[in-house]
Amino acid sequence: MNKNIYALCLLVFLGQNVFAQSNEFEEIIVTATKTEKTLQEVPVAVSVISADEVDKANIVDAFDLMQVVPSLDTRQYQTSRNAAFFIRGFGNGSNNNGVEPSVALFIDGVYRSKMQGRISDLPMVERIEVLRGPQSTLFGKNATAGVINIITKKPSFENFGKLSASLGNYNSRKYKAYYTGPLNDQVAYSFSADTHKADGHAKNTVTGGDTNNRDRYSLRADFLIEAADDLEIRVTADYDEYDEFCCQIGNVSVGPGKQAVYALGAQASPNDPFTDQVHYNFDPIATGENSGITINLVKEMDNMTFTSITSSRDSDSFEYTDIDFDSANMLYNETNVNLSAKSQEFRLASKGNEKFNWLLGAYFYQEDADNDSAVIFAGPAWRAYADILALGATQGAFDMAAVGAALGVPSSLIFATGQGSTGIFTQETDTTSFFGQIDINLSEKLTAILGASYIEDEKKATGVDVNTDIFSQIGLVGAGTIGFIQAGFDPATAAALAANPAVNRLLGFRAFQFLPRMQPFPNVGESGQSKDDNVDYTAKLTYLVNDNISVYGGISTGFKS
């Protein structure tokens, strides 16, 4: 568990980006501070992308936002699920499923904690707000680099429908359907469906298949209930699924190990990270599905507004990947990830007081994550690969069979097909946050903003390693004794070791011991639990120069769990 706090000082002259075409300045309403304000009033570096701009720029998913948002970067890693957002160069990406991103993403106020819940195509949006810099005061943990806040279009009491289709290169086909209208005087609804298919831009020379393709679809139902003049309830259910071959891996350098791959008669990726070819002995499978339901309640009172956002989400993914990334049948990785999350947020916000406006809130988040990941020796090519490297490293002195004989390990048990390591992990996360912010109007043009939040984040994890890789469990340092050398090799080697233990040539084989047996946890030395808490804050001054220009400066902190 890592906890990082950092601050940013901002001084921005009209520092907001609005992607909308108009002949005159348009008043843009945003919820970057969890209350509706004009863009000019918000002392945050924020880019606002309207629904029209989403269509014009052909923004399909959150990753496409980098085309129109300054300082936002997206990166794809080993599988569809392993991707990351970066804002101003800050972010993180990892194949570790327990790692949470540093850029928080919200859809209609609901936090999507892991990348596998973020990769679906966008629904019908009202606008998208990208906030730069730490936003933990109002948005909670893991908003240290910034926030992507997606607001979808509410159902309308006027009938409206939309069909769209687009075709592109790599046989890209995108189809979307949306319809909204009233059920009665108090209930409006909307339904949407979309599908996105495209051939991959990388060709697998072994199977003939495509890699980095697209095969996704999603469904969404939305109901808006105006239960009373002062009470609005919105219920949203969504489902999305992807079934793809991902991802292409390119080499940035070619090391000695690559020559061993060629010696096996196999193909490997060239020294070109931009190659459009891969040489996997099977197509890498990446599948997943996400579903959820959200209830958003807004109650208007005399001097304040009460908001409740309740959500339950589930996410499952499966990956089957050739992790030697060449045509030799050596290693594969199989990963299953299951996530279940529930969240509840309550907010009270004042209404339009001339002197000051305030916001108070509480947030509760609970997530269960199960992750099973296996690295398996896929076939005899792994043993043959190790033999080539062993003979080369010892100038032909011994291969893996000779090492096994000296260690007393039957040759047939070293890197046998089917051996490997399977890690079975669980993680429970409970997060509680209380937050508040007040805007004090010092004059008609000068406003002070003060905010603070308390965040408590508790995690409980378990881990078990089912390991059948015998070679990784051998202590090669201890095995390299004079007695061992005398028993297994020539006297000259024994004499050299006696004079200088550093010449123990067995130590070079530790590179093959990349699957050491993990100690199960919790255990005596590791509780498998962590509990962090932090107080975040923001303090800013904003000055309205005129109707089109504002100046602000301040400091904000962030919390990373």
Named regions from a protein language model:
Residues 25-158:
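Acidic, small-polar-rich N-terminal luminal/periplasmic segments of exported/outer-membrane proteins
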Residues 83, 100-102, 114, 123-126, ...:
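Outer-membrane beta-barrel translocator/receptor signature
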Residues 149, 156-158, 166, 177-282, ...:
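Periplasmic-side early beta-strands and strand-to-turn transitions of outer-membrane beta-barrels
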Residues 154, 182-185, 225-231, 300-303, ...:
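Outer-membrane beta-barrel strand-turn architecture
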Residues 163-167, 191-197, 235-239, 310-312, ...:
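Transmembrane beta-barrel strands of outer-membrane/channel proteins
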Residues 202-210, 247-279, 323-332, 374-424, ...:
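Solvent-exposed loop segments that connect transmembrane elements
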Residues 224-228, 348-351, 363-365, 429-561:
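Structural signature of Gram-negative outer-membrane beta-barrels, strongest in the C-terminal barrel
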